[in-house]
């Protein structure tokens, strides 16, 4: 749909739902990530899911597209690290399988490095707005989701220690 039509359809759908639990919306079409969508999220107090996924722009660009604002009324922020950008699901799955450890073809790339930096930046943006970042990692993004989350956590801690 067109961006304005998408917002209308979302509004019709969410108007019929109770306010709790707090919804966060994940859109996987870049052309829908426009000002009216983020304005609508803010008006309704709904959250946007910042997704690192095949066909979406980098997380930092999504942050910029959002107007550098967090919109969830409950103060929660969600990011999903699903697949490398420009990599189809089946290809990422085959590369990451059996998911027991980081896979260099996924975890040692410039894009993977940028993903970790973007999540780190989003964590500090959330902190600055008194929000909590929830990171949902997938094995396909790195080879092993627990290791990806550890890497992000260590990057955040390293940054915090550097500020002290």
Regions found by a protein language model. Give the residues of each.
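Residues lining hydrophobic/aromatic ligand-binding pockets adjacent to catalytic sites
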Residues: 1-164
């Amino acid at each position: 749909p067109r961006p304005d039509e998408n917002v209308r359809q979302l509004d019709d759908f969410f108007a019929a739902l109770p306010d709790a639990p707090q919804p966060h919306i994940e859109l996987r079409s870049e052309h829908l990530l426009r000002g009216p969508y983020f304005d609508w999220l803010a008006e309704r107090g709904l959250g946007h899911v910042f997704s690192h996924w095949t066909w979406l722009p980098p997380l930092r660009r999504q942050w910029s597209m959002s107007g550098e604002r967090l919109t969830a009324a409950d103060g929660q922020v969600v990011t999903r690290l699903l697949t490398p950008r420009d990599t189809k699901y089946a290809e990422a799955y085959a590369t990451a399988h059996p998911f027991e450890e980081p896979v260099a073809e996924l975890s040692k790339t410039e894009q993977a490095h940028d993903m970790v930096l973007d999540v780190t930046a989003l964590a500090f943006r959330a902190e600055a707005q008194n929000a909590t970042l929830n990171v949902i990692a997938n094995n396909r993004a790195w080879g092993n989701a627990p290791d990806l989350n550890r890497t992000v956590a260590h990057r955040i801690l390293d940054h915090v220690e550097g500020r002290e």
